[in-house]
Amino acid sequence: MTEENKSFYITTPIYYPSGKLHIGHAYTTVAGDAMARYKRMQGYNVHYLTGTDEHGQKIQKKAEELNITPQAYVDNIVAGIKELWEKMNISYDDFIRTTEDRHKDVVEKIFKQLVDQGDIYLDEYEGWYSVQDETFYTEHQLVDPIMEGDKVVGGKSPDSGHDVELVREESYFFRMGKYVDRLLKFYEDNPHFIQPESRKNEMINNFIKPGLEDLAVSRTSFDWGVRVPGNPKHVIYVWVDALSNYITALGYGTANEEKYKKFWPADVHLVGKEIVRFHTIYWPIILMALDLPLPKKVFAHGWILMKDGKMSKSKGNVVDPVTLIDRYGLDALRYYLLREVPFGSDGVFTPEGFVERINFDLANDLGNLLNRTVAMIDKYFSGEIPAFKANVTEFDETLVAFAQDTLKKVEEAMENMEFSVALGSIWQLVSRTNKYIDETQPWVLAKDENDREKLASVMAHLAEVLRQTGIMLMPFLTVAPSKMFAQLGLTDEAHKSWESLSTIGCIPAGTKVEKGNPIFPRLEMEVEVEYIKEQMKSSAPKVEEKKEEEPKAEEITIDDFFKVELRVAEVLSAEPVKKADKLLKIQLDLGTEKRQVVSGIAKFYSPEDLKGKKVICVTNLKPVKLRGELSQGMILAGEENGVLSLASIDQNLPNGTKIK
């Protein structure tokens, strides 16, 4: 491939727009952006894809809660996501939305092809389903399974820890097992396909070796998605819908496949470790079935955690990237994300660590080196950078060799997606250059006219290393390098290119420096740590401190209370009552009998939410008809600020147990 037509295709996951993005989402996207910028600087024709996965049950439910259409709901959130990426200088080349016709039309074609060739078939499915993850699990995959004897009756998702429910419905299935041997052979022939290596072992041992079951690829319990061609009661599920974005965005399956032919297969899919399975098992198998090339690499990064675990609004520990950018600048955040956590491992965000990185690395090391250099050139040479000469002082050659070695380390680290290592190498060069100042002591050289040549060499070397440092930082930081070049007086773009790093001393003699403000001001540690902590707390749900006093209920005797019969009941099923927005018709198991009750909780619970719940039922109420439906009791709920919440029990008591 010639220099002019070498291509590089990198993708992030397409994000699920169910709420505001946090620093964890920014982490993936900044990493992809750094890689895209690096490859562009190396002369590659880069295509950097990101986007949003906008279909599914969660989106539909959230939209219904807000009484708006799912499309209106996702349009609003996607606008916010795009604003965030603009604020973070994310240089994506395309933003794919799964609600766009260019995507949906091709997904329909892909699904039909897979049906026509026998890879997808129609059957009935029963399995454990997590609404939060929109994923089915086998009972062997469940965490904390709930048992009744030797039978699994519930449990939690292994991915998110949310409750699962037993779902039985008609579904289309993908014959996964048909491709297992080919997939394992592909792993063997392409040992670097899954990175880090530990993820590959996890996929083989946890998912493939236990037996890869056929995969449900359609749903009938919601309708927000791409319809199955010829059977519109089915919605194409996330595996075929969302994963296909990587080729639909390139125009695959359309009249214009120019981008697809140019960029596919992808050089790297960047994904979070929680979705490795989908990208390294399901997606390769789908591509095999379509007889398409597989991506060259899937790189699974870790999570940015907090001291108390994953970010959660309920914990009050969510870090909003916008808050950090507005106060500390974009580069401070980008640097922290890429330097603090080795890509592929989990890392812990702390306010203290964030402020320390700014003060020690950015302000002290880099900022101070630039300030000292520009100030000395201004003082000793009237602001003009002297001509570069090699080996004038005994320390010059060592510094130049260190800089050249740093370039090799950075390039090697970037090829391995080791952003933290690359930045660490650059900062070693910054430290070595600060040491060079101490070794050469320009303030001493300036006192002796006979040392004028040495002093000039020191200034030229400092300016040159800062030029190289600025260039090597350009994939990672999008603001500071330009400020560095401005203070060094560099205006020729050729002197800021990656290619120019192979030429030592290319700053023209007489280039005028321009003193400026510190590119990274030092921060007051205690003040800023407290500020960040307060911002994190503000992400927690607001708690009302004071409630209005409610009217006291009329006093009753204990005998009056005992007239009410309360029993534990389990919800077997629920469905909306026709022409009644607030009512659900609920079937209950009371141990010795089944009953139907009608309850006004439809605005707060979906039928899927209720199935399997243990509730408290008033069982000796006189039966009544509500909207034509018989109600044989009442389930208890509490109300706060117009929101209902069902009363429940904290022990798994048998159905029918009397509440005393």
From Swiss-Prot:
Top-level enzyme category: ligase
Motif ('HIGH' region): 15-25
Main subcellular location: cytoplasm
Family of the protein in this entry: Belongs to the class-I aminoacyl-tRNA synthetase family. MetG type 2B subfamily.
PANTHER family per UniProt: METHIONINE--TRNA LIGASE, MITOCHONDRIAL, METHIONYL-TRNA SYNTHETASE
PROSITE patterns: AA_TRNA_LIGASE_I, TRBD
EC number: 6.1.1.10
This protein's GO CC annotations: cytoplasm
Transmembrane segments: none
Residues engaged in binding ATP: 313
Motif 'KMSKS' region: where in chain: 310-314
SUPFAM superfamilies: Anticodon-binding domain of a subclass of class I aminoacyl-tRNA synthetases, Nucleic acid-binding proteins, Nucleotidylyl transferase
Annotated tRNA-binding domain residues: 560-660
Compartments where found: Cytoplasm
Gene3D superfamilies: 2.170.220.10, HUPs, Isoleucyl-tRNA Synthetase, Domain 1, Nucleic acid-binding proteins
Organism (species): Bacillus cereus (strain ATCC 14579 / DSM 31 / CCUG 7414 / JCM 2152 / NBRC 15305 / NCIMB 9373 / NCTC 2599 / NRRL B-3711)
One function term, GO molecular function aspect: tRNA binding
Keywords for the protein's UniProt record, in alphabetical order: Aminoacyl-tRNA synthetase, ATP-binding, Cytoplasm, Ligase, Nucleotide-binding, Protein biosynthesis, RNA-binding, tRNA-binding
One example of a Gene Ontology biological process annotation: methionyl-tRNA aminoacylation
Protein known as: Methionine--tRNA ligase 1
Function: Is required not only for elongation of protein synthesis but also for the initiation of all mRNA translation through initiator tRNA(fMet) aminoacylation.
Catalyzed reaction equations: tRNA(Met) + L-methionine + ATP = L-methionyl-tRNA(Met) + AMP + diphosphate
Quaternary structure annotation from Swiss-Prot or TrEMBL: Homodimer.
